């Protein structure tokens, strides 16, 4: 029986995406995230047994490596990368790293125990595909099986993106989802009434996973998933473009986004750590957008821009 090596990194919640990326880059075959914020108030509602996660600002990110991996070298690299992240101003907290061996069948399913139904916005709830769930009146349920390499939709950057979509979509819109990942933003757009959604990702695995998740949700045949490099080569205009990716990538798509967003349409940008906020604002303003909403959770920022000639109540442009 093949065994796997499990490495758990305890860091501040704000460092979740950056640290997950580091773990994948060091050879991890997937990551699972235990965040106490995802379980607050859930026990009484679902009557389930939940992981023993103490309420705090720290989270546990568990990565899985093949048994052939030199774990000492991996841990040394992780510590170096975490120190570098801290030097850039990202809040990582008091970092600790643990490791253990794991059997094949445990590796395949271990991450699922950290993934439970979560009410993300007023209307939207994300539910793992293997969990039975009774939705309340008016509640819109997104079923996800993201696999270990994709987020479960509970990260602040995703939450803010979903909140923005909920506030903007009124029904009948065309939406473009750039860097779709698990497909959660596209599925939400469909449930919120968008007429047509185009979802793009450079990663073929993401394209496959997004399509699988779309197929888990009824009434989502209006979502079209394809491989794509940001908005390059895209000619379809949209009422809303949403992108929840790294700030350094967001600045590369603002000009194309302005070309494609219809007049009075919106651009939602998320995944922005505070130290790179000005860079993203400058890129969007230079493209011609006006800022309508700025959301903040911890070190993370989400921005809602509008393409408009009516600049009352908006900033920039």
Swiss-Prot record:
Gene3D superfamilies: Vaccinia Virus protein VP39
One GO CC annotation: cytoplasm
Keyword terms: Cytoplasm, Methyltransferase, S-adenosyl-L-methionine, Transferase
Subcellular location, principal: cytoplasm
Known EC number: 2.1.1.-
Subcellular localization: Cytoplasm
Molecular function as annotated in GO: protein-lysine N-methyltransferase activity
An individual GO BP term: methylation
Keyword hit for S-adenosyl-L-methionine: yes
Residues the entry annotates as binding S-adenosyl-L-methionine: 158, 179, 201, 244
Reaction(s) the record says it catalyses: L-lysyl-[protein] + 3 S-adenosyl-L-methionine = N(6),N(6),N(6)-trimethyl-L-lysyl-[protein] + 3 S-adenosyl-L-homocysteine + 3 H(+)
Enzymatic class: transferase
Record-linked HAMAP family: Methyltr_PrmA (MF_00735)
Family: Belongs to the methyltransferase superfamily. PrmA family.
Function, as annotated: Methylates ribosomal protein L11.
UniProt-recorded name of the protein: Ribosomal protein L11 methyltransferase
Organism field: Streptococcus pyogenes serotype M6 (strain ATCC BAA-946 / MGAS10394)
Upper taxonomic lineage: Bacteria, Bacillati, Bacillota, Bacilli, Lactobacillales
């Amino acid at each position: 029986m093949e065994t796997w090596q499990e490495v758990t990194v305890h860091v501040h919640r704000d460092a979740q995406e950056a640290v997950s990326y580091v773990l994948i880059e060091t050879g991890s075959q997937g990551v699972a995230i235990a965040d106490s914020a995802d379980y607050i108030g859930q026990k009484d509602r679902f009557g389930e047994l939940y992981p023993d996660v103490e309420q705090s600002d720290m989270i546990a990110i568990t990565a899985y490596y093949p048994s052939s991996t030199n774990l000492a070298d991996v841990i040394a690299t992780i510590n170096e990368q975490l120190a570098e992240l801290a030097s850039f101003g990202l809040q990582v907290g008091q970092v600790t790293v643990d490791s253990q061996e794991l059997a094949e069948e445990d590796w395949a399913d271990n991450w699922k125990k950290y993934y439970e139904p979560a009410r993300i916005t007023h209307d939207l709830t994300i539910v793992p595909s293997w969990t039975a769930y009774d939705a309340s009146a008016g509640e819109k349920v997104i079923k996800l099986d993201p696999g270990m390499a994709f987020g479960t939709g509970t990260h602040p950057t995703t939450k803010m993106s979903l909140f923005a979509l909920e506030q903007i979509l009124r029904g009948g819109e065309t939406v473009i989802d750039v860097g779709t990942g698990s497909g959660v933003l596209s599925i939400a757009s469909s449930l919120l009434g968008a007429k047509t959604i185009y979802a793009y990702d450079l990663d073929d695995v993401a394209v496959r996973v997004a399509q699988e998740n779309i197929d888990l949700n009824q009434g989502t045949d209006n979502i079209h998933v394809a491989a794509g490099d940001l908005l390059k080569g895209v000619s379809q205009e949209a009422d809303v473009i949403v992108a929840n990716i790294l700030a350094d990538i967001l600045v590369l798509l603002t000009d194309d986004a302005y070309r494609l967003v219809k007049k009075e349409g919106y651009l939602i940008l998320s995944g922005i750590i505070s130290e790179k906020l000005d860079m993203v604002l400058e890129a969007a303003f230079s493209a011609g957008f006006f800022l309508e909403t700025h959301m903040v959770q911890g070190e993370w920022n989400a921005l809602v821009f509008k393409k408009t000639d009516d600049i009352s109540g908006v900033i920039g442009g």
